[in-house]
């Protein structure tokens, strides 16, 4: 258990946006995997930011979870950005010596958090992530993802990473505190990877299986893909220096 005034070994930032009741089962799966591993010194940062006027039960569900679970840290604010804004707000609430980032929709297996934790705790790496060796989410999503990763490597040809948007991502606190993250939209994963490169962080990538989302439609479509590309090009032109 986390002792009063002590910081946890691991903070798990879970993006809960519009997950509603599905987030309850996902949290249970995460905690089951941590329990099997014998990892008790952790916190769950549950990011349930919302759009004003939009019907979404997730904030209330997360508040209820946090009232019953002392390891849960709720982050609930009216949204002033997209996915990146949620991630940055979650990072700001995380206190762990290691910070994990994962979506709460069940497509990324919770057991991967433990797999990456083991790799990171070896002390060899500052940053560890998955790459999706097998995908069960359909040909359309696979095509969009491959096209996006191809374009990323065209614009940033010396980037060695295999799968930019794959999660979980685990990073040491020291490395996270050095990152300059500003993207409020869908390119946040790309910005993280470019910061890994800028800071010359040691990293590892571990293969995983990416599941189909059984209980809600994905938020990733051609519109979000184009937003990611626009942000990628803007980053290439205005911010990145080889």
Enumerate the predicted regions with their spans.
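The conserved acidic donor/metal-binding loop of glycosyltransferases
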Residues: 103-107
């Amino acid at each position: 258990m986390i002792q009063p005034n002590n910081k946890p070994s691991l903070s798990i930032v879970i993006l809960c946006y519009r997950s509603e009741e599905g987030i309850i089962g996902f949290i249970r799966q995460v905690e089951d995997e941590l329990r099997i591993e014998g990892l008790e010194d952790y916190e769950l940062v549950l990011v349930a930011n919302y759009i004003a006027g939009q019907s979404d039960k997730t904030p209330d569900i997360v508040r209820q979870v946090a009232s019953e679970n002392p390891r849960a840290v709720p982050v609930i604010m009216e949204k002033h950005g997209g996915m990146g804004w949620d991630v940055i707000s979650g990072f700001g609430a995380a206190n762990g010596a290691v910070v994990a980032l994962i979506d709460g929709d069940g497509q990324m297996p919770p057991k991967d958090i433990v797999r990456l934790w083991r790799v990171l705790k070896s002390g060899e790496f500052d940053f560890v992530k998955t790459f999706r060796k097998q995908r069960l989410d359909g040909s359309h999503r696979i095509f969009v993802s491959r096209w996006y990763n191809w374009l990323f490597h065209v614009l940033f040809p010396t980037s060695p990473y295999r799968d930019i948007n794959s999660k979980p991502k685990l990073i040491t606190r020291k490395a996270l505190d050095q990152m300059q993250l500003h993207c409020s939209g869908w390119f946040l994963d790309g910005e993280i990877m470019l910061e890994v490169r800028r800071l010359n962080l040691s990293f590892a990538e571990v293969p995983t299986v990416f599941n189909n989302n059984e209980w809600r439609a994905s938020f990733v479509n051609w519109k979000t893909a184009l937003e990611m590309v626009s942000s990628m090009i803007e980053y290439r032109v205005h911010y990145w220096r080889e």
